[in-house]
């Protein structure tokens, strides 16, 4: 009996030691990554916000992850998900034809401009908003189907995101004024919401597959998170660029080879209105974050 007890005790203690060793290794990686991001931030001369999740191990890494950053166009990834969630509830028809006129289109509406005579399906408009950052598609969808910026915020609250807030339309939401809370979220909230929508149970399997394919087909992110991973890893992302205060961002679901998916959210902003954004900074922050959760 004594030998059995001793064996069980030894096994338990061994398991605890392994767990502590893994925890310490991850903590050391996180500390090293934070120092690297801090140096990157100093070189960038602005703020960098990061949150990353390994959905397999549960490891996370954050840097300024609870601070607010301007969303810019990155909210359009969640707009597309909001459309699909309503399609799932049979409140909207993804094949519904949407008609519009030139006066409905804002600057940078590359896809909706092509079809302003014939119109587009709701699904094609949603994918254009995500994959091409089409502002015409974005505003039309928000106005006619989602209840405007307030409706977008309500949708995000419905999935448990209490940080996201959308206050204005395209193009007004891109001011990115330091300290302005309008049209902002946090890197951690963005990553968690993406995890719920792209990999979780908010969307059923059929609709979720559509959403994942839309993310994978994004055309605007090649120089950002996509540039931080091996070529054979699959990435689905949504970028944002405000065009002011060097503000730009990207968030992604990453499917590595033979591993569970990763979630990465990178937000950047600078001090002066005329400062330029840096795709390389976003890519490097992503690379560091992925190493930290490995």
UniProtKB/Swiss-Prot annotation:
What residues make up the catalytic site?
73 (nucleophile), 172 (proton acceptor)
Output the Gene Ontology terms for molecular function.
beta-lactamase activity
Q: Where is the signal peptide?
A: 1-27
What is the E.C. number?
Answer: 3.5.2.6
**Pfam families registered for this protein in UniProt:** Beta-lactamase2
Activity regulation, free text: Partially inhibited by the beta-lactamase-blocking agents, clavulanic acid and tazobactam. Not inhibited by EDTA.
Positions binding a beta-lactam in this chain are 73, 76, 133, 135, 239
| Positions of disulphide bridges | 72-242
Tree of life domain = Bacteria
Extract the InterPro entries matched here: Beta-lactam/transpept-like, Beta-lactam_cat, Beta-lactam_class-A
- SUPFAM superfamilies (alphabetical): beta-lactamase/transpeptidase-like
Q: What induces it?
A: Up-regulated by the carbapenem, imipenem. Expression probably regulated by upstream promoter elements.
Q: Which reaction does it catalyse?
A: a beta-lactam + H2O = a substituted beta-amino acid
Report keywords, A-Z. Antibiotic resistance, Disulfide bond, Hydrolase, Signal
* NCBIfam families in the record: bla_class_A, blaSME, classA_carba
Q: What more does the record tell us?
A: The class A beta-lactamase family has a specific amino-acid numbering system, sometimes called Ambler or ABL numbering and often misspelt as Amber. A multiple sequence alignment was used to derive a consensus sequence and then the consensus was numbered taking into account insertions and deletions. This allows use of identical numbers, e.g. for active site residues, despite differences in protein length. UniProt always uses natural numbering of residues, hence there appear to be differences in numbering between this entry and some papers.
Recorded protein name is Beta-lactamase SME-1
Protein species of origin? Serratia marcescens
